[in-house]
From Swiss-Prot:
Its EC number is 5.3.1.26. GO terms for biological process: D-allose catabolic process; galactose catabolic process; lactose catabolic process via tagatose-6-phosphate; pentose-phosphate shunt, non-oxidative branch. InterPro entries: LacB, RpiB_LacA_LacB, RpiB_LacA_LacB_sf. Heteromultimeric protein consisting of LacA and LacB. Pfam families: LacAB_rpiB. Pathway: Carbohydrate metabolism; D-galactose 6-phosphate degradation; D-tagatose 6-phosphate from D-galactose 6-phosphate: step 1/1. Keywords: Isomerase, Lactose metabolism. One of its GO terms (molecular function) is galactose-6-phosphate isomerase activity. This is Galactose-6-phosphate isomerase subunit LacB. The keyword Nucleus does not apply. Belongs to the LacAB/RpiB family. It comes from the Bacteria. It comes from Streptococcus pneumoniae serotype 2 (strain D39 / NCTC 7466). It catalyses: aldehydo-D-galactose 6-phosphate = keto-D-tagatose 6-phosphate.
């Protein structure tokens, strides 16, 4: 199984720990970064993880930022992604079994590394349990997806990053 993983600069260490855990379990990890603590932007990494999952490059995705809120919102903008921000096993299993989630999101400063690893392992092994009801719910969710042709451009974030480098944006 191939698992895409991405994070922002706030949780690089946590992502590396999760990545090493997954590798130790025999999973192929596709690490989209970030790889250090240099200030960066979570939408970039959420987009990369989401695109890897929806293109078939990865089977599942894991997104981590400080609270998990930002990167999870970003990855959910990729058409075909169904990501759940979780902090507990029950929510993660519900997301996979009932909503066929293909990405899982965490707040790396909220949820500890060991718990994240346990939840991810359970998420990987959980199976979607299709029913007429949840098929209809998933179809309604998919109907809400917005397809932005610009989003598939490899340079989608270039202008934003150039403005950042010029000091036009601030934290």
């Amino acid at each position: 199984m191939r698992i895409a993983i991405g994070c922002d600069h706030i949780v690089t260490d946590e992502k590396m720990a999760v990545s090493e855990f997954l590798k130790s379990k025999g999973y192929e990890v596709i690490d989209f970064g970030t790889y250090d603590h240099t200030r960066t932007h979570y939408p970039i990494f959420g987009k990369k993880v989401g695109e890897a999952v929806t293109s078939g490059q990865a089977d599942l995705g894991v997104c981590i930022c400080g609270t998990g809120v930002g990167i999870n919102n970003a990855v959910n903008k990729v058409p075909g992604v169904r990501s759940a921000l979780v902090r507990d096993m029950t929510t993660a299993l519900y997301a996979k079994e009932q909503l066929n989630a293909n990405v899982i999101g965490f707040g790396g400063k909220i949820t500890g590394e060991l718990l994240m690893c346990d939840i991810i392992e359970a998420f990987i092994h959980a199976e979607y349990k299709p029913s007429e009801e949840n098929k209809k719910l998933i179809a309604k969710i998919e109907h809400l997806e917005s397809h932005n042709a610009q989003q598939t451009d490899a340079n989608f974030f270039t202008e934003f990053l150039e403005k950042w480098d010029r000091g036009e944006y601030h934290d």
